[in-house]
């Protein structure tokens, strides 16, 4: 049976180098499951694989979208499942790596068939969010779908807005489209989680932010600043520097905020991943143990 090896873990843990070693060991390409590496022109802030790394191993789902393109976990599921059906014709084991929790779950479990939202409805809601804030949109969700209102992370404006988009477009509660039925995949899924001691991970995150700044993150963010309203740029590393460009923060404060928000995101990732009993955890330096585990799983 064909296999999909998923190397996952928090930001900054060291997934990239290990994924290259695993891919080379099993003769596999790498599929990125990082929701921001999909976009062009953001290689530094998204820690995208370098040209040298992409020369070592063929990569997919990296630098394929414009900043203005709308893309969701549902799109990712469709694209990656289709890609795997082609790759598995000649490559029995394929590696996927990244830390975008929803994207990984989309490939492993599938996403319910939610209607596609029209640009007019999406634009209207984001305009309302920009002018009025999230409170009236939350109130609309509570009225239209009290079940999902109780379940959704009400601080996550993207999820709140998406639910209201569906309610407006269909006239039905967003929750009515959710079945929570796991889809069957025609391949074995092997999940390997990477984690480090908390202090070690925090130090790596801080050092990585400093390295990104030395490699030109400030200039990369400045080029993206005219597009700051786009969802593709509502991400750690850019939104903080946008506050510096607007005069709201000093550069030192913006950099400290990037480090802090990256650490917070890493904790959120681990909270999500720790709920999954299918993940076998390793320290990234335990390469031989990881290879042994994978060799036993891939038959």
UniProtKB/Swiss-Prot annotation:
Site (Interaction with substrate tRNA): 100, 122
Keyword Aminoacyl-tRNA synthetase included in the entry's annotation: no
EC number: 2.5.1.75
UniProt KW Magnesium keyword: yes
Cofactor: Mg(2+)
Sequence segments annotated as region (Interaction with substrate tRNA): 34-37
Residues bound to ATP: 9-16
NCBIfam families, per the entry: miaA
Entry protein name: tRNA dimethylallyltransferase 2
Originating organism: Parabacteroides distasonis (strain ATCC 8503 / DSM 20701 / CIP 104284 / JCM 5825 / NCTC 11152)
Upper classification of the organism: Bacteria, Pseudomonadati, Bacteroidota, Bacteroidia, Bacteroidales
């Amino acid at each position: 049976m064909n296999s999909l090896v998923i190397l996952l873990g928090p930001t900054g843990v060291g997934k990239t180098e290990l994924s290259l070693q695993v891919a080379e060991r099993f003769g596999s390409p790498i599929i990125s499951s990082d929701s921001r590496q999909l976009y062009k022109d953001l290689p530094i802030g998204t820690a995208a694989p370098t040209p040298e790394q992409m020369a070592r191993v063929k990569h997919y789902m990296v630098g394929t979208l414009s900043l203005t393109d709308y893309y969701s976990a549902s799109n990712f599921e469709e694209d990656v499942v289709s890609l795997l059906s082609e790759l598995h014709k000649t490559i029995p084991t394929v590696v996927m790596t990244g830390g975008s929790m929803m994207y990984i779950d989309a490939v492993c479990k599938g996403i319910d068939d939610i209607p596609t939202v029209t640009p007019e409805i999406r634009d209207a809601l984001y305009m309302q969010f920009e002018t009025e804030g999230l409170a009236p949109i939350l109130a609309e969700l509570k009225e239209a779908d009290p079940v999902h209102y109780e379940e959704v992370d009400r601080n996550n404006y993207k999820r709140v807005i998406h639910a209201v988009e569906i309610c407006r477009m269909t006239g039905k509660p967003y929750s009515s489209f959710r079945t929570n039925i796991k889809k069957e995949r025609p391949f074995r899924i092997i999940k390997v989680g990477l984690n480090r001691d908390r202090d070690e991970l925090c130090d790596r995150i801080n050092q990585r932010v400093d390295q990104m700044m030395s490699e030109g993150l400030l200039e990369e963010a400045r080029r993206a600043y005219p597009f700051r309203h786009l969802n593709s740029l509502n991400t750690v590393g850019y939104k903080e520097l946008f506050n510096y460009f607007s005069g709201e923060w000093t550069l030192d404060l913006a950099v400290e905020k990037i480090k802090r928000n990256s650490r917070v995101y890493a904790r959120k990732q681990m909270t999500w991943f720790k709920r999954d009993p299918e993940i076998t955890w390793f320290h990234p330096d335990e390469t031989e143990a990881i290879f042994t585990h994978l060799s036993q799983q891939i038959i």
